[in-house]
């Protein structure tokens, strides 16, 4: 049997013509009518088969003519272009052939390939008082606080500062011994840590890899970027325990104490600890009229957060204390 004959047998026109031929004229006998009469169920089955074959013909034509989509993630949440998978591509063609998705290239559905995936923005409103890390849920914050419960076992005998790891203590002892094993290849200046030497080389190369997402200003060190972002947010995490004045940098708080409260011991708390009485379980709550935030809009108004600032990585909050410790270390070296 030839291919042309097979296509004619299973075409929509041939099926519908068979249905028309099966109809019985009124002049035929009852026996002939019963013999050749097609019931409604049989008629509907013929029509369903005709519709199915019509759909298959459309799919075959679309598969031969339409180009496959590029590997683009149209939902923005999957790590691969799932429409390139055969099962999803067939489902998309079937929906287009049935008229569920229009074939007009100017329509929003057809232009789905040109959409740019938008990464989801995760807001972390819960703030740790001790290390300034941010978390999205209270449960994550409570789990993190267990880190601060454990005692620090390694203590520096010269200054009394304690550490959780012996490696951190060994690095700290280099400050007291003034051992600087890492020299700069450009100017010869030596540093205690290799990371400090690498940051220093940015001065010679002019490289500024850390860029502010709000104003576009670039910095050579991440600590400078973290301090800079506080100007946009108005966030002042360091507070004087004597007068309550808050500062964006730890070094500014220390200078304030030396000039305004020279007789008091060096015991300052963070701004989050001042507002701990206003928040449940000691979680940081921005200062408002009643001590709590009524809405997300009030949260944005308190911190003066522009929309672009929400895209800043939460990891920057994890580096805040490390950056301020670097400033404190530099100040100690300059004083000594």
Swiss-Prot record:
Localization (cell): Nucleus; Cell projection, Axon; Perikaryon
A single Gene Ontology CC term: nucleus
Molecular functions (GO terms): DNA-binding transcription factor activity; DNA-binding transcription repressor activity, RNA polymerase II-specific; RNA polymerase II cis-regulatory region sequence-specific DNA binding; transcription corepressor activity; transcription corepressor binding; zinc ion binding
Record's function text: Transcription factor. Plays a role in the determination of neuroblast cell fate and neuronal differentiation. Negatively modulates expression of several components of dense-core vesicles (DCVs), thereby, in a DCV membrane protein ida-1-dependent manner, regulating neurosecretion. Negatively modulates the transcription of its own gene, the mechanosensory gene mec-3, and also other touch neuron-specific genes in the BDU neurons; required for coordinated movement.
ZnF (C2H2-type) intervals: 126-148, 154-176, 182-204, 210-232, 238-260
Protein's name in the database: Zinc finger protein GFI1 homolog pag-3
Keyword Coiled coil (UniProt): no
Tissue: Expressed in the BDU neurons, the touch neurons, the VA, VB and VC motor neurons, two AVF interneurons and unidentified neurons of the retrovesicular ganglion (at protein level).
Residues covered by region (Disordered): 253-290
UniProt GO BP: negative regulation of apoptotic process; negative regulation of insulin secretion; negative regulation of neurotransmitter secretion; negative regulation of transcription by RNA polymerase II; neuroblast fate specification; regulation of backward locomotion; regulation of forward locomotion; regulation of neuron differentiation
Subunit structure, as described in the record: May interact with transcription factor unc-3.
Effect of residue 223 to F: In gv560; significantly increased levels of ida-1 in a subset of neurons including VC4, VC5, and ALA. Significantly increased levels of synaptotagmin snt-1 and serotonin, whereas rab-3 and unc-31 levels remain unchanged
Gene3D superfamilies: Classic Zinc Finger (3.30.160.60)
Keywords: Cell projection, Metal-binding, Nucleus, Repeat, Transcription, Transcription regulation, Zinc, Zinc-finger
Species the sequence originates in: Caenorhabditis elegans
Keyword field contains Repeat: yes
Source species, domain of life: Eukaryota
């Amino acid at each position: 049997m030839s291919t042309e004959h097979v296509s004619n047998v299973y075409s929509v026109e041939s099926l519908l013509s068979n249905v028309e031929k099966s109809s019985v004229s009124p002049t035929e006998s009852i026996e002939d009518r019963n013999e050749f009469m097609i019931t409604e169920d049989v008629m509907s089955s013929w029509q369903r088969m005709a519709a199915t074959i019509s759909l298959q013909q459309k799919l075959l034509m679309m598969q031969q003519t339409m180009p496959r989509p590029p590997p683009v993630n149209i939902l923005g949440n999957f790590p691969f272009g799932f429409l390139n998978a055969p099962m999803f591509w067939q489902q998309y063609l079937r929906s287009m052939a049935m008229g569920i998705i229009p074939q007009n290239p100017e329509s929003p559905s057809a232009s789905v390939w040109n959409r740019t995936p938008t990464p989801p923005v995760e807001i972390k409103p819960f703030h740790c008082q001790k290390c300034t890390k941010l978390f999205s849920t209270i449960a994550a914050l409570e789990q993190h606080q267990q880190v601060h419960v454990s005692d620090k076992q390694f203590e520096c005998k010269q200054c009394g500062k304690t550490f959780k790891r012996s490696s951190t203590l060994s690095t700290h002892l280099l400050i007291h011994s003034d051992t600087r094993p890492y020299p700069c290849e450009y100017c010869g200046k030596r540093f205690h840590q290799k990371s400090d030497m690498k940051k220093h080389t940015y001065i010679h190369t002019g490289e500024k890899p850390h860029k502010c997402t709000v104003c576009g200003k670039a910095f050579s060190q991440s600590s400078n970027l973290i301090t800079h972002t506080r100007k946009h947010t108005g966030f002042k995490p360091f507070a004087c325990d004597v007068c309550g004045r808050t500062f964006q940098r730890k070094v500014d708080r220390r200078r304030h104490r030396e000039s305004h409260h020279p007789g008091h011991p060096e015991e300052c708390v963070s701004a989050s600890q001042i507002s701990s009485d206003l928040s449940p379980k000691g979680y940081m709550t921005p200062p408002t009229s009643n001590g709590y935030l009524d809405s997300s809009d009030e949260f944005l108004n308190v911190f003066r957060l522009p929309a672009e600032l929400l895209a800043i990585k939460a990891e920057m909050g994890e580096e805040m204390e490390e950056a301020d410790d670097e400033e404190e270390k530099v100040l100690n070296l300059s004083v000594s």
